[in-house]
A protein has these predicted regions:
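Short helix-initiation/N-cap motifs at beta->coil->alpha
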Residues: 17-22, 96-111
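Periplasmic solute-binding protein
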Residues: 1-15, 21, 32, 38-65, ...
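Alpha-to-beta junction loops
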Residues: 31-33, 111-120
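Long, aromatic- and glycine/proline-rich binding clefts that accommodate carbohydrate-like moieties
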Residues: 146-150, 199-254, 258
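Glycine-centered hinge/linker elements that transmit conformational signals in sensory
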Residues: 24-26, 66-97, 147, 151
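A local structural motif
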Residues: 8-13, 68, 85-101, 113-114, ...
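Extracytoplasmic/periplasmic substrate-recognition and gating elements
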Residues: 9, 133-203
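Short, solvent-exposed loop/beta-turn-alpha elements that line the ligand-binding surface or hinge
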Residues: 56-78, 133-141, 152-161, 212-220, ...
Length: 282
């Protein structure tokens, strides 16, 4: 969230869906954007739905993905309902399905500073270190203040957990004739290299618990947000971000779009996804 908009209209960061809906209404009433999502991109739709579902019942979400709980379960149907409500309640911006995240949506938030809120992952913290002049002004200019926050989607008093994924993995070829040299490089990447990518460039979240965070050139506001992300990544993890089942994932993506368009009900979407789940080889 870009806090200059919240300060301008005397608003607090929303902590649950009902508060989010009211904040978005206030922004809309004053000619501002509500919560921005690049819903043309399936990955952000799936990320958001999984966050909603994990907030309602983490165990059932991952059990359903593995084919052990039906997607027609009432908790999962509720997750589809909340996703659809984000469009019908005006939480997401008008025309969200027609714009992507990168860079249609991210430029408005990161470079123009023209939207109050955006849905994105912890990697967006890299904007604090972006050499682009517009980003520098938005994130490091006088009075700049941004906050990363999680949502209580079902208004039960508990914020959603985060989902995590491996972004880059390193491996040594079993047939290599220079395994020792390869390991030297891998070991460097895990330690000195990782320190450069995190503390020198803020390109990734730290994967090592023993890494001391001291990002060069990161302002106080950025440091606060980084510490928040690291804390959530350590102590509030729902599960994995990337599901292993391509056909099921595609069906979920399609149904999330249909829900956003209002062409299906949450119950109908659940039926379609459950059929795909039953047909999915695991």
């Amino acid at each position: 969230a870009n806090m200059k908009y919240f300060d301008k209209y005397g608003l607090e960061l929303p902590t649950n869906y009902d508060e989010l809906k009211e904040v978005c209404k206030t922004f809309r009433d004053n000619g501002e954007y509500p919560l921005v999502i690049g819903a043309k991109d399936s990955w952000i739709n799936i990320d958001t739905w999984m966050n909603i579902a994990a907030d309602i019942n983490t165990e059932k979400l991952y059990s359903a993905i593995e084919g052990e709980t039906p997607f027609t379960d009432e908790d999962l149907v509720q997750s589809f309902q909340i996703w659809q409500n984000c469009f019908t309640d005006g939480v997401f911006q008008d025309g969200a399905l027609g714009v992507g995240m990168y860079t249609d949506s991210t430029d408005m938030y990161q470079k123009e500073g023209s939207v109050p809120m955006i849905l994105n992952g912890s990697w967006s913290l890299g904007a604090y270190m972006d050499s682009d002049e517009q980003s520098q002004e938005v994130y490091n200019g006088e009075g700049a203040n941004h906050k990363i926050f999680l949502m209580d989607w079902n208004n039960d008093g508990k914020i959603a957990p985060v989902e995590e994924a491996v972004d880059v993995s390193l491996a040594i070829n079993n047939q290599s004739k220079v395994k020792d040299a390869a390991w030297t490089f891998v070991d460097w990447m895990i330690h000195e290299g990782a320190d450069t990518l995190v503390n020198g460039q803020l390109q990734y979240m730290p994967a090592r618990n023993d890494m001391e965070l001291n990002v060069e050139g990161l302002n106080e506001n950025g440091t606060e947000n980084l510490e928040y992300c690291v804390e959530q990544g350590k102590n509030n993890v729902g599960g994995y971000r990337e599901m292993a089942y391509a056909e099921l994932k595609e069906t979920i993506s399609n149904e999330l779009t249909e829900l956003a368009l209002g062409d299906v009900t949450p119950e109908e979407a659940a039926d379609t996804i459950e059929a795909a789940s039953q047909a999915q080889e695991r």
